[in-house]
Each structure stands twice: as structure tokens, then as C-alpha cells.
């Protein structure tokens, strides 16, 4: 049984990328007397099955600043900690098939310029030059983020954990929070199956468990986990040939009106649809023993997105499916994860 400290300035609950990043940033701000509690293994909730995209695009100035900060941090975090985060700045192309969509991109370009995020506008022919497996039919243009791309979420989490530990933070895995109570002096008691911790602050980063965590302090946290699927395909000889010839990795391709993204993965492709009306899950919270959990895939639910992807990228129709990931992602009422 691992000994657990009895006091801390901050207790962070939840060992996904959000919780471990919070711990890392507290240490970087000079608060070394901090710890994190994770009921299972780090990343074992939603982080492990995330596709890891780094979308700089956001119409909000404040959220856009966070996205820019995050991408820049990930670029240097591996060197800082010695833990590779798997960042791939392969770019991101957002397609426009109508003027309303292009006007949205033009409006965003003003936000991007204010933030200091580089964007480019492409003609349909330029899209195909960069992403040769895409068809330009129906396109009026596109917007490209040259510095966008993806990261490996589990590796990123481990880099944050290493940086936090090096700064003095403690991480307690396989430790379950059983209660949170505010004491008469304003301090908090976090009760776990390995002992109690008295602390000044508690930070909940519990994802799909957020409602259960909130109930411990009398809060109704408006978070609903929903199912989110993405498809990983078998490899394709033409994609493998590109890599063998030393050509650059295909960037992230987004069909905004079709509500999907696609990127290269191990000689094949990943298709990530954003389903309208995706079913909610964990309505009563995940099982206490839930770890690295996936749900049964539902390809029929994805067919409109698959058909749209086949139209835009015909080789997608030729590819066998290697794996369908269907995992929980926690959403709030404003639609943001």
C-alpha cells in the first residue's frame, strides 16, 4: 500500500491529460506542495483513446489564445522533460464548399491575426497539390493552418507527469477519492481509500466522473459524456509509396460541412466524424472499475460521414477498417468538451 501525504496546498483529482497538465502548471507557477489522485492508471479515462488533434481554429479570442499557447507548449515540452510527446505539425486544411463557410474563415482570419496565428487561404487546385488524394469537386477554396497537426495524448500526459514530478509534485495512482469535505477553518479534507489529505484547494479534472465528483461537495456539474467514434483504416500502397519517397505526411483535412476530419496514420487514414445527436453514455456515471473502456462501434450511425468522406477522398473507399474507437467524451451544455 502506497503511503499518501496528509497535507497539500492543492489536490488535483483525475489523471487524464487535463488533470496532469493542471498539476504541471501549478508546479511551474511555484506551487510544489501539490499532488494528483487517479483512481486507476494515468490516461485510462478518455485521454488514451483521443485522436490528439491540435485545432488552432476557434472563433473565440480567449479560447484561441489557449489553443496557441498549448501548441507552442507541446513543441518544447518534449525537450524540456526528455519525454517525446509525438507532436506532428503536419498542418490542417479546412475546406469550404460554399460562400458562407468561406466568410466564416475570413472572419476567423481577423481573430487569428490578432492572436498571432498564421493562416493561409488556398484555391481548390492548391488543396489538391497539398492533399493529392482529395477531389476538388464543389470546393470554392480552403483555409490552412501551417502549424496545426496532432499529438499523442498518452505521451503528452506522461511528459506533463514527468515535468510535475521533477518540480516536486506527487502522483498517486490506483487511489480512489471517497469524499470531499470543507472544514470549519475553510480547508478541505479529501478522503481516499489510502488516507485523508487536508488541503487549501481541490481541483476536479474528472471528465466523465465530473458529476459524481461534484455531488461530493453539493454541486450539480452540467457535464454529459457522449459517445464519439473514429475509424482507423488499413494501409494503402499509394500512401506508403509517398512515405517511401520521402514526401511529407498528409496534413489534417477537415470537411466542415460534412462534419468530419481525416489524417494520415501508419500508411492508412483516420476518419473522425462529429455525429449530430450522438448518444449520451454514463448517465449515472461510469462504473467504479471502468478503465480503458470502449463501447460497441456503430458503423451505421457513421454512414453519412463515411459517404461524404468517400466522395471527397475516393481512396477511402478502398481501405479496410483496422479499428473503430468508440469512447466517451464529456461535453458541457455549450457544446465544448
Where are these regions (language model features)?
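Gly/Ala-rich phosphate-binding loop of Rossmann-like dinucleotide-binding domains
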Residues: 23, 27-28, 163
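Glycine-rich FAD pyrophosphate-binding loop
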Residues: 27-48
Amino acid at each position: 500500500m502506497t503511503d499518501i501525504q496528509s497535507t497539500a496546498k492543492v489536490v488535483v483529482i483525475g489523471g487524464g491529460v487535463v488533470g496532469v497538465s493542471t498539476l504541471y502548471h501549478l508546479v511551474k507557477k511555484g506551487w510544489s506542495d501539490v499532488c494528483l489522485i487517479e483512481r486507476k492508471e494515468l490516461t485510462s479515462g478518455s485521454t488514451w483513446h483521443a485522436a490528439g488533434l491540435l485545432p488552432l481554429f476557434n472563433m473565440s479570442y480567449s479560447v484561441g489564445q489557449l489553443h496557441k499557447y498549448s501548441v507552442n507548449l507541446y513543441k518544447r515540452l518534449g525537450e524540456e522533460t526528455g519525454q517525446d510527446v509525438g507532436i506532428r505539425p503536419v498542418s490542417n486544411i479546412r475546406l469550404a464548399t460554399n460562400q458562407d463557410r468561406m466568410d466564416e474563415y475570413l472572419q476567423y482570419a481577423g481573430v487569428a491575426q490578432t492572436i498571432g496565428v498564421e493562416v493561409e487561404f488556398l484555391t481548390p487546385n492548391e488543396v489538391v497539390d497539398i492533399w493529392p488524394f482529395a477531389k476538388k469537386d464543389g470546393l470554392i477554396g480552403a483555409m490552412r493552418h501551417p502549424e496545426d497537426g496532432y499529438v499523442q495524448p498518452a505521451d503528452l500526459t506522461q511528459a506533463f507527469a514527468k515535468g510535475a514530478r521533477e518540480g516536486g509534485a506527487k502522483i498517486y495512482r490506483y487511489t480512489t477519492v471517497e469524499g470531499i469535505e470543507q472544514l470549519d477553518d475553510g480547508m478541505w479534507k479529501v478522503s481516499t481509500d489510502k488516507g485523508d489529505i487536508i488541503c487549501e484547494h481541490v481541483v476536479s479534472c474528472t471528465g466523465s466522473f465530473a458529476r459524481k465528483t461534484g455531488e461530493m461537495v453539493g454541486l450539480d456539474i452540467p457535464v454529459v459524456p457522449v459517445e464519439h467514434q473514429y475509424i482507423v483504416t488499413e494501409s494503402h500502397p499509394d500512401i506508403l509509396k509517398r512515405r517511401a519517397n520521402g514526401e511529407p505526411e498528409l496534413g489534417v483535412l477537415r470537411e466542415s460541412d460534412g462534419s468530419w476530419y481525416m489524417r494520415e496514420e501508419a500508411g492508412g487514414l483516420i476518419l473522425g466524424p462529429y455525429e449530430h445527436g450522438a448518444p449520451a453514455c454514463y448517465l449515472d456515471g461510469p462504473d467504479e472499475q471502468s478503465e480503458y473502456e470502449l463501447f460497441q462501434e456503430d458503423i451505421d450511425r457513421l454512414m453519412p460521414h463515411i459517404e461524404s468522406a468517400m466522395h471527397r477522398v475516393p481512396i477511402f473507399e478502398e481501405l479496410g477498417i483496422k479499428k473503430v474507437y468508440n469512447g466517451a467524451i464529456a461535453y458541457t451544455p455549450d457544446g465544448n468538451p
